[in-house]
Amino acid sequence: IGYRLRGQDQIVRSIEAVKRASRLGVRGFLVYDEGCPLVLDQARKAGAIPSDCHFKMSAHAGVSNPCSARLMETIGLDSINPVRDIQLQMLSAIRQAVDIPIDIHTENPASSGGFIRHYEVPEMIRIASPIYLKTGGIVAGTHSWDTTAEQARLRAKQVALVKRVIDEYYPDALASSKGSISW
């Protein structure tokens, strides 16, 4: 089944956590459950949480086709992470179905596949922009563990490697300007 909120109590708790975090200035939230963003978007529209809160669907939710991606956009998500091993033609079909940004993993920790997709990145940009590239995951042995200072340096190296591939194979690609992502 994957990560999901179990029961209405967990929905309420997650909404309260978003309210509290937003009072502390947090504006970006990663969600795992399809029901939660539906309610969070309604709360955002009603003014119960700030209108500039950004909700992103986790790759763990299994978004892997245009219909599920469109559903995510319809329920108020601001961006989606499709499954990590999504094929390029599938990614292209998702882009045709939604207007929201897509977050795409360029690599993964060994515990969730351990693959590296750096040479696919230029094509990902061509077919799926606007996209956010999620790079550096291969450095982590497992998903969602704390990052050491050394792993942070290695993650930065992975970012530089992806940037080199983009510069070499798609030099006309445009990056978001610094500060353009406000959440």
Which residue ranges define each predicted feature?
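Short, glycine/polar-rich helix-capping loops at beta-to-alpha or helix-loop-helix junctions
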Residues: 64-68
